[in-house]
UniProtKB/Swiss-Prot annotation:
Protein known as: Adenylate kinase
InterPro entries given in the database record: Adenyl_kin_sub (IPR006259), Adenylat/UMP-CMP_kin (IPR000850), Adenylat_kinase_CS (IPR033690), Adenylate_kinase_lid-dom (IPR007862), P-loop_NTPase (IPR027417)
Protein family membership: Belongs to the adenylate kinase family.
Membrane-crossing segments per the record: none
Localization per Swiss-Prot or TrEMBL: Cytoplasm
């Protein structure tokens, strides 16, 4: 089973990706991880990508697509794979299609922006340990204080409301065209990837079940 998983920051995509990968015995593949491994190992594509990154440039879609095609030939992809954060653009999606990289499902975890903002801007962190709390869902025993050390909790800059809103704007600008692309393809071609939206509100198990039901309904 070959899956593309989409979802905004704070939607719980990482947790659900792990659940899907465990259920179907497939690897979770992100372009960031692929780039790091290729650069570390020193593959031809990795060397090429490193030169570009060292000069401050952006790695081209062509290199990314070739890394993806190389990665999915590995033995751990025999049952399929899950793309996390890829494709990001219509160009990348069309390159996958042109190169006949089979995708069975495109699953989008949908969470309203206000819920995402509440989830992320409510986080409070103990910087030394990395322990994370939430002002609503996982409160410390004493407001603003780490349970273990008694030290002050902080809101990381990444979790500020303005930063979260900015990240959501970027996500929507990137993702909505992709969703439209896959929906349009599915409407025209019975062999196209099946697109489904799963509401990402509720318990982790409730969201997991919605995703599994989407996959089963098209199986």
């Amino acid at each position: 089973m070959n899956i593309i998983l989409l979802g905004p920051p704070g939607a719980g995509k990482g947790t659900q990706a792990t659940n899907i990968c465990n259920k179907y015995s497939i690897p979770q593949i992100s372009t960031g991880d692929m780039l790091r491994v290729a650069v570390k190992v020193g593959t031809p594509l990795g060397i090429e990508a490193k030169k570009i990154m060292d000069s401050g440039g952006l790695v081209s879609d062509n290199i990314i697509i070739n890394l993806v095609k190389e990665r999915i030939q590995h033995s751990d992809c025999k049952n399929g794979f899950l793309f996390d954060g890829f494709p990001r653009t219509i160009t990348q999606a069309e390159a996958l299609r042109k190169d006949s990289v089979k995708i069975n499902f495109v699953i989008e975890i949908q969470v309203p922006d206000q819920e995402i903002i509440a989830r992320m801007s409510g986080r409070r962190t103990h910087l030394k340990s990395g322990r994370t709390y939430h002002i609503t869902y996982n409160q410390p025993k004493v407001e603003g204080i780490d349970d273990i050390t008694g030290e002050k909790l902080v809101q990381r800059s990444d979790d500020s409301e303005n930063t979260v809103r900015s990240r959501l704007d970027i996500y929507h600008n990137q993702t909505q065209p992709l969703v439209n692309y896959y929906q349009s393809w599915m409407d025209k071609d019975s062999n196209a990837p099946k697109y489904a939206a799963a509401i990402g509100i509720g318990t982790l198990d409730e969201v997991k079940d919605r995703i599994y039901n989407s996959l089963i309904s098209y199986d």
